[in-house]
């Protein structure tokens, strides 16, 4: 088995999908989890205005709507959380995503004050954060807020990780990577677009250039610039297609060096890191 085949198998990626079937699969997955653990009353998700959180948010709300109708349990809710750092440049996209999702509840937590306070405390301890590390601080602050909300609403935190993100480890460890349940896992980027199109999402929300937008020195830096490959390259690779050798090498290097991000904390029983 080639490394490409191993990666595809590990991430559960498929060369083709039926959008309606995958929508139903994700909704039923969320519903089954909530029904298995009836003490869970809410799904909590940060909404950025990008493709992934828009899709995950819509699926969450659809799952909650169906469960309420089927069970009569009106205590169930989906909580969409806006988590800007100061003023977000694409705030209108966030509002458009909220309008599309129609969440039960919307909360806004501006993380800038908390991030600056943490940075100052570290500075006083003799640690000066780089712009890159400050970006990770933002991601972790966002997740901290979501877990606080989930804790106060008997909820779980929903993630947006998918195959095209997991393969490169393009998430912050214990930031956006630290979630309870990931309904998009298995899909690649273009497949996520297919689901949003089938759901009637405004096109500009899934045709915009993806960006983590964590760095102050390089605002709205496209993911593809950081990764050195395009999402079309990554999706082709995940679909088992032939890609240029340099593209395959870049993707595989990302996968291998970020293996630790896709695993629980390393113990004495782990040996993957010795390869």
Swiss-Prot record:
Gene name for this UniProt entry: nadE
Top-rank lineage group of the source organism: Bacteria
Residues reported in the UniProt entry to bind Mg(2+): 52, 165
Keywords tagged on the record: ATP-binding, Ligase, Magnesium, Metal-binding, NAD, Nucleotide-binding
Keyword Lyase: no
Broad EC category: ligase
Residue sites binding deamido-NAD(+) per the record: 140, 173, 180, 260-261
E.C. numbers: 6.3.1.5
Pathway linked to the protein: Cofactor biosynthesis; NAD(+) biosynthesis; NAD(+) from deamido-NAD(+) (ammonia route): step 1/1
GO cellular component labels: cytoplasm
Protein name: NH(3)-dependent NAD(+) synthetase
Naturally occurring in which organism (per UniProt): Shigella dysenteriae serotype 1 (strain Sd197)
Ligand binding (ATP): 46-53, 160, 189, 211
